[in-house]
Amino acid sequence: MSKKIVIIPGDGIGQEITDSAVAVLKKVSDKYNLNLEFESHPAGGTAYDLCGTPLPQTTLEAAQNADAVLFGAVGGPKWDNVEPTLRPEKAVLGLRKGLGLYANLRPIKVADALVEYSPLKEEIVKGTDVLIVRELIGGIYFGDKCESEIYEGNERAWDLENYSVPEVNRIVEFAMQAAKKRKNKVTSVDKSNVLATSRLWRRTTAKVAEKYPEITLENLYVDNCAMQLAINPSQFDVIVTGNLFGDILSDEAAVLSGSIGMLPSASIGKSTSLYEPIHGSAPDIAGKGIANPLATILSAAMLLRYSLDEQEAATCIEQAVDKALAQGYRTPDLYKEGFIKADTKTMTEAVLKHI
């Protein structure tokens, strides 16, 4: 039985980088007899130009009926003056809501060949392989809020943070299951010395952990975790945390690799999940054929790992990327004298030959 993968290239370099990832998926599909089918749909500014909306209903329905979605990037200065409700970025929010995406996964792995690109010293960053699991649809971002009110004669604004036990259960269960396939360690991050929601988070996490005696659970305050990511990132395996803390920590950790062009991500849904690079649409280099496709190729590996449970095929892609880098291939965002300068096509071919 075939598996349907919906491709949403989006804007800017989105088409180029998703084309690269699809080429890799097709080759790995042939190698492992995965029987993948691909279907492309518009979103973002491109969709707005075509249909007058950043997320056509046909695109959303196709995504909802797919086994997985591979997403490029959206946005660009061309649409800066579009009505706010029709901005390209609204496509991402619509997909999150329409697919019920509740967990964001951000793997931070520093390839041996790229250690020198990290802002941290080699002895600190080498061996870093962290998976940050961020709760995506709860917490302060989605709580009640007030932009402005007068209280005791002064203007104030407020945002309400809340989490329920089922929301915490779901995200912590996911983190525990992910850790079972890695190094059996979960670090739960909160601010339970100050916040009531964090105290509920910590109590609930402890109860979930009782079902996983093989998993080592540690709890860290978010400020300590932020510091530890900078001074000893290799100590972590899986980090699980709420929406706000996860947003901040995942962006901090992204710096460790030295280039956002290397970092994939996944947003996990109840039935369909979405995979995308963390970088933007880079309209300044769109159409030039020089974009780094590796984050999108690694997002495709995550798709195989988490949506299709094709662990061997996912590892094959990840190892092919490592081998291409070890051979010295570098796109312009990573190029230094002494390496092989590669455009998008050349880098993709360098990965393909190792599959």
Show where each model-derived region lies.
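Buried hydrophobic positions in well-ordered alpha/beta secondary-structure cores of metabolic enzymes
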Residues: D11-G14, D67, V133, A175, ...
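Buried hydrophobic packing segments
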Residues: A21, L25, T205, T296-S307, ...
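Glycine-rich phosphate/pyrophosphate-binding loop and the adjoining helix
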Residues: I137-G138, G143-R182, V186, S192-V194, ...
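N-terminal beta-loop-helix "entrance" segment that forms/cooperates
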Residues: N33-Q57, M227-L229
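Short acidic loop-to-helix transition motifs that present clustered carboxylates
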Residues: A113-V115, L220-M227
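N-terminal glycine-rich phosphate/adenylate-binding segment common to multiple enzyme folds
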Residues: D49-W158, L244
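Glycine-rich phosphate/diphosphate-binding loop of Rossmann-like nucleotide-binding domains
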Residues: V6-A23, V28-S29, E152-D223, Q235
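Glycine-rich phosphate/nucleotide-binding loop
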Residues: G45-Y48, L229-Y329
